[in-house]
Amino acid sequence: MIFLNIISISIRLLLILTLITGILYPIVTTGFAERFFPFRSSGSRVVIQGKIVGSELIAQKFIKDEYFWPRPSAMDYAAGASNASVTNVFLKAKVEERKKFLLEKHSEQTQVPPDLLFASGSGLDPHISPDSALFQINRVAKSRKLTEGQILRLKNIVEESVEKGYIGENRINVLLLNLKLDSEFGIILK
């Protein structure tokens, strides 16, 4: 009898907790997010002329010289990391390959910022450091036949400051910077 009583209580508890944590809690939190944070709750989608062109939260692959490039991705801009340790020969070779490529494309530079060499942990980081943007300004300006000053002005407009004045570092959202380039100086069609 005690055994059946324990089973009955366990099943009721399972059903109640499933209802609370599996149905009610997700509905309440989703409703709260959509009510008070509609832009963020829908994925921070960037919409231009009625068309979704990306998300502020997810990196996109830009390969044309006319655009700023994001951090490299271990999984070709899908979620995931290489999980290679710092002693991994494959990781070292990949970093050297990236460094060689970047220095060839930016011959006036001698040092590559670390965030352009190392993939982000998630593979989806949409930001680069201000140093990485400055590293690329000459290439982007030459490719678009603009002055570095014109590009620098846009970089300064989209640069995000540290949160709450002390958390993290300044950063630049690559998608927003490239969209700003297109809106100010025209879309590159090649």
UniProtKB/Swiss-Prot annotation:
It is a single-pass membrane protein. GO terms for cellular component: plasma membrane. Coiled coil: none annotated. Signal peptide: none annotated. One of its GO terms (molecular function) is P-type potassium transmembrane transporter activity. It is found in: Cell inner membrane. It comes from the Bacteria. Keywords: ATP-binding, Cell inner membrane, Cell membrane, Ion transport, Membrane, Nucleotide-binding, Potassium, Potassium transport, Transmembrane, Transmembrane helix, Transport. The keyword Kinase does not apply. It holds the Pfam family KdpC. The chain crosses the membrane at residues 13-33. GO terms for biological process: potassium ion transmembrane transport. The keyword ATP-binding applies. Belongs to the KdpC family. The system is composed of three essential subunits: KdpA, KdpB and KdpC. Part of the high-affinity ATP-driven potassium transport (or Kdp) system, which catalyzes the hydrolysis of ATP coupled with the electrogenic transport of potassium into the cytoplasm. This subunit acts as a catalytic chaperone that increases the ATP-binding affinity of the ATP-hydrolyzing subunit KdpB by the formation of a transient KdpB/KdpC/ATP ternary complex. HAMAP family: KdpC. This is Potassium-transporting ATPase KdpC subunit. It comes from Leptospira interrogans serogroup Icterohaemorrhagiae serovar Lai (strain 56601).
